[in-house]
């Protein structure tokens, strides 16, 4: 038996938060294009909009007047149900893929930008 180091065992990602300038425009992108559902907020902050995927994973959109400058490697990653279909949809509606490729485990990925310039990764299922 392998001895576990002192650590907190995590099960899954609960939510990620993205800072946006226009929550309505961002909801069109995340709900309309990526399939999130708008759900009731569980906090008393009118500047945070809660979205959820069928898996239960959540995205919180925090609306501010000025979204902070972020390094290019900071992003949220979402697994596509069908990677090829997702790529075709993005091509069809004119959303450009900034970078794409295949990782060592065979997982394919592509990066796009949301309406506020936040980097978003769309990926296939992990190969591990």
What is each residue range found by the language model?
Residues 1-24, 74-76, 126-128:
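N-terminal beta-strand motif that seeds the catalytic metal site of vicinal oxygen chelate
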Residues 2-9, 50, 87, 91-128:
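Vicinal oxygen chelate
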Residues 17-58:
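Core segments of cupin and vicinal oxygen chelate
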Residues 45, 72, 106:
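Exposed loop/turn and edge beta-strand positions of beta-sandwich/beta-sheet ligand-binding modules
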Residues 75-84:
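Mid-chain, well-packed structural core segment of small domains
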């Amino acid at each position: 038996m392998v001895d576990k180091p002192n650590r907190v065992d995590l099960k899954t990602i609960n939510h990620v938060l993205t800072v946006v300038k226009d929550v309505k425009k961002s909801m069109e992108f995340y709900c309309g294009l990526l399939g999130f559902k708008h759900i009731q907020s569980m906090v008393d902050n009118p500047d945070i909009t809660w979205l959820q995927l069928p898996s239960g994973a959540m995205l919180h959109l925090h609306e501010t007047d000025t979204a902070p400058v972020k390094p290019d490697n900071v992003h949220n990653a979402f697994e596509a149900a069908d990677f090829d279909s997702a790529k075709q949809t993005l091509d069809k509606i004119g959303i450009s893929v900034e970078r794409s490729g295949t990782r060592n485990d065979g997982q394919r990925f592509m990066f796009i930008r949301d309406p506020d310039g936040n980097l978003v990764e769309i990926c296939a299922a992990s190969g591990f």
